[in-house]
């Protein structure tokens, strides 16, 4: 099954390369999305906080501790218990988890730029009225699939006024993530541990400004998560779905998201898909390199 998924992704990558545009924004007619490409995808500036987060990533990549590992979301072969079978039973090295599950540096930093961009162009949905006018009260950010917390740290470090709620299925991995945030001095993250319950998720979430979904890589679970999140998002929200070409199931889910009447524009970066909801713009799907 692992070999089959690998071949599937290779074919998907070739198809993507044959149709993808560059990241300069050429061919994007929406001023809003053109600005998004310029400020988020094409920006190569780095920030001090990012260096600390990358030091944390490198620490995880060399961490040989073994932890009891439960994975509800990789899409790999599972045993009768629902737990993914790994080469060493239910125990894995932290370094192996880091290698297989952490978002690449460029994508994690792109997500941070996305949060920054939305925060600097905030709207009444995430503002409160004061004597001096509208005052930014922070973004509500949701992450499904915490892993070791590196991407979570990027999402949260942008602005301490933002609130990040992240969901992680494996208690041992969540514990390491929480220790990482503490060492980085990041205090605006709430981590919910355990398998994601869709009904509970629906009750817990209110307004969502940014969502990053990197959880259960099956069609049914992905669609269930997306349906809940769509109901919490507004015109200026952005949803990011990871691993959209991971398998036929994930590609099916991604195609249905692109066709959803609630969605206006989508961007396929191969590794990730981005979803926009502003009804002022024509419905359009972009395939782009990053």
Task: Label every PLM stretch briefly.
Residues 2-212, 216-238, 245-290:
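A short alpha-helical cap/connector motif
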